[in-house]
């Protein structure tokens, strides 16, 4: 009995170590996110260059006039909230709480979907007012930057779906906990990028 208790005591630290120690998946994710950061840095540079040219000829202000800032703020809050739910999902994964992971990640997917639908509605509204990707430099800059970000949100939501599908088909393992953490890293990154885009596009204009 003493031996069994000793083995049980040793198992817990090993399980925690398996969840917390650096691994190639996490390192690879950090490298990938660094590349994504450079990609979005390029988009920001393109946006500000276009802005400088547009302000010079007076076309930029006309395009920004169509933006609905209060509406954009609402969908921004929704996306930021999804980052909170994603982190609660990670906490559940660290505890080995499969039900908690499913609940919080499902809510994250739902919030991400609401954000995407909200952005699609905004696109529809702008197109109705004559602003398209081909209508002006402002239109091109707006749709390219927000469109690429929306694609990343969609990719993140699909990654959460994959994590949930894997949970439904096998026992919960440290590898699955790592996958949950890695996807959350990506999701937090996408949310931070949107905050930067929101401030740049809707407030600085």
Swiss-Prot record:
It catalyses: 4 Fe(II)-[cytochrome c] + O2 + 8 H(+)(in) = 4 Fe(III)-[cytochrome c] + 2 H2O + 4 H(+)(out). It comes from the Bacteria. InterPro entries: Cyt_c/ubiquinol_Oxase_su3 (IPR024791), Cyt_c_oxidase-like_su3 (IPR000298), Cyt_c_oxidase_su3-like_sf (IPR035973), Cyt_c_oxidase_su3_a-hlx (IPR013833). It is a multi-pass membrane protein. It is found in: Cell membrane. One of its GO terms (cellular component) is plasma membrane. One of its GO terms (molecular function) is cytochrome-c oxidase activity. Its EC number is 7.1.1.9. The chain crosses the membrane at residues 28-48, 72-92, 104-124, 142-162, 184-204. GO terms for biological process: aerobic electron transport chain. Keywords: Cell membrane, Membrane, Translocase, Transmembrane, Transmembrane helix. Associates with subunits I, II and IV to form cytochrome c oxidase. This is Cytochrome c oxidase subunit 3. The lineage of its organism: Bacteria, Bacillati, Actinomycetota, Actinomycetes, Mycobacteriales. The gene is ctaE.
């Amino acid at each position: 009995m003493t031996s069994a208790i000793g083995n049980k005591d040793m198992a817990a630290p090993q399980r925690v170590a398996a969840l917390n120690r650096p691994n190639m998946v996490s390192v690879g994710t950090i490298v990938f996110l660094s590349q994504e950061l450079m990609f979005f840095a390029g988009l920001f540079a393109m946006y500000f260059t276009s802005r400088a040219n547009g302000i010079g000829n007076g076309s930029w202000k006309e395009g920004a006039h169509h933006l609905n800032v209060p509406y954009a703020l609402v969908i921004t809050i929704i996306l930021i909230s999804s980052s909170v739910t994603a982190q609660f999902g990670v906490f559940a994964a660290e505890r080995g709480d499969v039900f908690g992971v499913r609940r919080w990640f499902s809510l994250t997917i739902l919030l991400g979907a609401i954000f995407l639908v909200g952005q699609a509605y905004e696109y529809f509204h702008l197109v109705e007012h004559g602003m398209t990707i081909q209508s002006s430099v402002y239109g091109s800059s707006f749709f390219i930057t927000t469109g690429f970000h929306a694609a990343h949100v969609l990719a993140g939501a699909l990654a959460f779906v994959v994590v949930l599908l894997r949970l439904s088909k096998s026992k919960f393992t440290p590898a699955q906990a790592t996958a949950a953490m890695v996807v959350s890293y990506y999701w937090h990154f996408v949310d931070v990028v949107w905050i930067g885009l929101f401030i740049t596009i809707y407030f600085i204009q």
